[in-house]
């Protein structure tokens, strides 16, 4: 199958290229970047030297989409929406990496992303790209919207407990994110000198992944659970650790059993419970470069809560990995093709 990538110079596109290069069912045909047109991919993605001998194209996204079987849109939020309607008319399969088609309620885009969504009919066409919860829908769809990275880690952590009797139906989430989560732009706050030795509360309230987390948890549990999230940038390049406080009276063996049973058939979900290991709880260090989500849970009887931990690579399980897993399902490939890669350890 021939695929193309629009917005090929960003970090997420780089991870798509790294994994698709070794996918036995895929030919990468066109990769576009207006700012790097004509340059070799390896100039921007040096890890691809001697791996992919391609150059960036400046081809119009719709024209590009017409020449491939499936297109990945790796564009900033609010940009994909300008091209999807025309690509939809062509009939090319779409996997959108932005937030433009994640939310089912178009009014939420005004509140959380600052733009009007004028294509509510297309919102219904896109499936939320979490294979663990939408496998059958993805299998029968041509259009997938990949979840946000913090949203992914939070949903994986909270979902197994969301159908239980939570106190007040409120979950508090502390998210710690590496610098690559901000993308490859030139904002000075991303500079090494600004971020090094810093733990910055960059979004202590009103994080824009909140509505998609609440939307997905309602889909899974049928309940309106509120998410109170605070997000921090930390001194690492890639990875996310979410710590979710779920207020429920549940002892640790039962909490672990709930988590284990919920994900018992999921190859890319790993339960971390080894109190003698250096990594006794989920840690981003052990998932870097992989499509795994590492989950763990601890019970706190003192105030009747459980603490559910999730660690993912923000650029893989939080973006490119889930995109490729969804692509595999959509096209009836082996779901794990191109994705069973262990972490580089130590790093």
Swiss-Prot record:
**A GO-annotated cellular component:** cytoplasm
Q: Which GO terms describe its molecular function?
A: N-acetyl-gamma-aminoadipyl-phosphate reductase activity; N-acetyl-gamma-glutamyl-phosphate reductase activity; NAD binding; NADP+ binding
The record's active-site residues are 149
Instruction: Give a Pfam family name.
Output: Semialdhyde_dhC_1
| Positions of NADP(+) binding | 9-12, 314
Which InterPro entries would you find in this protein's record? Answer: AGPR_type-1, LysY, NAD(P)-bd_dom_sf, NAGSA_dehydrogenase, Semialdehyde_DH_NAD-bd
Task: Provide the primary localization.
Answer: cytoplasm
User: What is this enzyme's EC?
Assistant: 1.2.1.103, 1.2.1.106
Keyword list (alphabetical) reads:
Amino-acid biosynthesis, Arginine biosynthesis, Cytoplasm, Lysine biosynthesis, NADP, Oxidoreductase
Pathway this chain belongs to: Amino-acid biosynthesis; L-lysine biosynthesis via AAA pathway; L-lysine from L-alpha-aminoadipate (Thermus route): step 3/5; Amino-acid biosynthesis; L-arginine biosynthesis
Q: Which GO terms describe its biological process?
A: arginine biosynthetic process via ornithine; L-arginine biosynthetic process; lysine biosynthetic process via aminoadipic acid
Quote the subcellular location field of this record.
Answer: Cytoplasm
Q: Which residues form a coiled coil?
A: none
> CDD domains, per this entry?
AGPR_1_N (cd17895)
The family assignment reads: Belongs to the NAGSA dehydrogenase family. Type 1 subfamily. LysY sub-subfamily.
Output the NCBIfam families linked to this UniProt entry: argC
Function description? Involved in both the arginine and lysine biosynthetic pathways.
Instruction: Tell me the protein's name.
Output: Putative [LysW]-L-2-aminoadipate/[LysW]-L-glutamate phosphate reductase
Gene (name only): lysY
């Amino acid at each position: 199958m021939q695929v193309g990538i629009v917005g090929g110079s960003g970090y997420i596109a780089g991870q798509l290229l790294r994994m698709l290069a070794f996918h036995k069912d895929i030919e990468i045909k066109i990769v576009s970047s207006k700012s790097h047109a004509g340059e070799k991919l390896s100039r921007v993605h040096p890890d691809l030297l001697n791996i992919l001998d391609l150059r960036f194209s400046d081809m119009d996204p719709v024209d590009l989409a017409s020449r491939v079987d499936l297109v990945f849109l790796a564009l900033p939020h609010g940009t994909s929406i300008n091209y999807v309607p025309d690509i939809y008319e062509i009939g090319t399969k779409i996997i959108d990496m932005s937030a433009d088609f994640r939310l089912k309620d178009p009014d939420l885009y005004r509140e959380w992303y600052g733009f009007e969504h004028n294509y509510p009919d297309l919102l219904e066409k896109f499936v939320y790209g979490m294979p663990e919860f939408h496998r059958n829908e993805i299998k029968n769809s041509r259009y997938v919207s990949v979840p946000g990275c913090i949203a992914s880690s939070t949903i994986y952590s909270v979902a197994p407990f969301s159908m239980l009797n939570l106190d007040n139906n409120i979950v508090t989430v502390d998210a710690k994110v590496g610098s690559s989560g901000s993308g490859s732009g030139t904002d000075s706050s991303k500079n090494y000198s600004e971020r090094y030795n810093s733990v910055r509360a960059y979004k202590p309230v009103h994080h824009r992944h909140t509505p998609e987390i609440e939307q997905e948890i309602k889909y899974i549990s049928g309940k309106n659970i509120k998410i109170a999230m605070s997000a921090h940038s930390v001194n690492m390049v890639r990875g996310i650790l979410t710590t979710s406080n779920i207020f429920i009276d549940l002892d640790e063996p039962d909490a672990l059993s709930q988590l284990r049973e919920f994900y018992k058939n999921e190859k890319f979900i790993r339960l971390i419970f080894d109190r003698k290991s250096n990594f006794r709880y989920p840690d981003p260090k052990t998932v870097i470069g992989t499509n795994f989500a590492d989950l763990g849970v601890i019970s706190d009887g003192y105030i009747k809560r459980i603490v559910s931990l999730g660690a993912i690579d923000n650029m893989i399980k939080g973006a490119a990995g889930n995109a490729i897993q969804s692509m595999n399902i959509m096209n009836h490939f082996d779901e794990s093709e191109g994705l069973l890669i262990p972490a580089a350890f130590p790093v």
